[in-house]
From Swiss-Prot:
GO terms for cellular component: plasma membrane. It is a multi-pass membrane protein. Belongs to the major facilitator superfamily. DHA1 family. Polyamines/proton antiporter (TC 2.A.1.2.16) subfamily. Residues 9-43 have a biased composition (Polar residues). This is Efflux pump FUB11. Efflux pump involved in export of fusaric acid, a mycotoxin with low to moderate toxicity to animals and humans, but with high phytotoxic properties. Constitutes a self-protecting mechanism of the fungus against critical levels of FSA within the cell. SUPFAM superfamilies: MFS general substrate transporter. The gene is FUB11. It comes from Fusarium oxysporum f. sp. lycopersici (strain 4287 / CBS 123668 / FGSC 9935 / NRRL 34936) (Fusarium vascular wilt of tomato).
Amino acid sequence: MAIDPQPSSPSLSSETIANDTIGNDNNVNEPSVEPKTQGNQHTVPPRLSRIYSQAHHISQSFIDQNYPGEGTTQAPYRINFLPDDTQNAQLLPRWKKWAFVLLQSLACLATTFASSAYSGGIKQVIRAFGISQEVATLGISLYVLGFTFGPLIWAPLSELYGRKKVFFFTFMVATAFSAGAAGAGSIASLLVLRFLTGSIGSAPLSNAPALIADMFDKSERGLAMCMFSGAPFLGPAIGPIAGGFLGEAAGWRWLHGLMAAFTGVTWIACTVFIPETYAPYILRKRAQHMSKLTGKVYISTLDADKPPSSAAHQLKNALTRPWLLLFKEPIVFITSIYISIIYGTMYMCFAAFPIVFQKGRGWSQGIGGLAFTGIVIGVVLCIISFAFEDKRYARAARKRGAPMEPEDRLPPAIMGSLLIPIGLFWFAWTTFPSVHWIVPIIGTVFFAWGLVLVFMALLNYLIDSYVIFAASIMAANSALRSLFGAAFPLFTRQMYDGLGVQWASSIPAFLALACVPFPFLFYKYGRQIRMKCEYAAEAANVLQKMRSLHVTVTEDDAMNEAEEMWRARTHNSHASAAHSHGHRRSLSYTRSV
């Protein structure tokens, strides 16, 4: 998924500021000084404030560069990062990149931790408000439902206003709402605050992968994504463990206080240490400030050939385009359904495990949370195994000496597709109280291992298959799986009451078993299927163009081109049908005469 780079550099030293900086042109007490220009060289007014330089990272060295263009509205100077530009995220030291990945992964962990930690205090919520189990479970479902809508909004806004601003605002508000939930006076206010926290706090789920793409090139991105991808699964697995003990000992309000504290600490850490990393935003703001300071017109090279796009236009595309691709592309639809089923099964466990271990075996609320240890172990095993898979893929790419096919991403999904039903059936039919408790938990290790293998491999497959449409594809996948994750816990209790523990636990196992052929089919026939899919074929054409001509094509450009091709094919097919129909009528008339 190609997303442009971003971070801001360390602050300029005081000596650098004194000798090589630009100040604040908003000081009304300073006389207006016109900059002197010599060709493309501009002398900055010497009395401008240091604050401007520190805030916007503009130094005289940026102004002194020889940029293409004439500095006019018709032919603006086109700026790009300098060779040693400290604001270019791709040039950050490796240790900083990995530190930022760790911090963003913690932010995702905090968000997903809160989705399931609530289950640890669900008994206390029922007693406090006198509600049913189903109503109390809405606290999980509504939170996860927020994951459906949040990323669709925050992803495009991060491209307009930068990753850092969007994260700062969303996580600040999410922390406040999470703290507010701790003091909720009614079940209605608690559920509303849970939904809002999930919606607003879900920004890292979409922006963290974008930040990784900002900092790492494709050869390094796999390992970083592997590290990040564990967070959305570790969080829900760890949540009931911590939540079970705290909810039992201190009550559900303290549990929400823990969620707010976790979110707040990660908000502060990420805000303080992670700079802006989105290259188009950095260069856009730099061009605006340089234009303001010099009186000349500057524009980012990344924006130079793009038509202006408003926030409303980007939001419209963000909200509609994912669903268009989801329902028009068979590959996207099938893989998203598969991922959604196994993702929903994971969230079903938060309602099923208390039935199996607390009700069935008499475990306490805190000890019952430890049943999720198997899922934690499975996720960790998958992260380790995927690190080796990433090295295998890199070796295969070097050996081939040519671009790898998207289908080369699928071997882990094939393995994972087998592990999931094995683990689920293992769990289902070893839940009898007469069987030692460790046996069903071992089954959840295989389930979680397979789940994350399938999840990561299929997402990589979709990204490589759709390239320029990857952002919309990821949004569609995220929205659909969040809907499943919100829905599955709601019918879990009724299903277990009606079918019994063993058969109810087998339902998702049968669904996973039905999905086993999909990775095999895509591995063998994926290329032929992609070439018959409208947008996958266009993505392949765009990728070929980018490789041969070394040009950058935006998602909007590719979408427009794909839609034009589709309209042309539709017009040609209609014209052909009309011609054929007219020909048949002519023959019929000739025969009748």
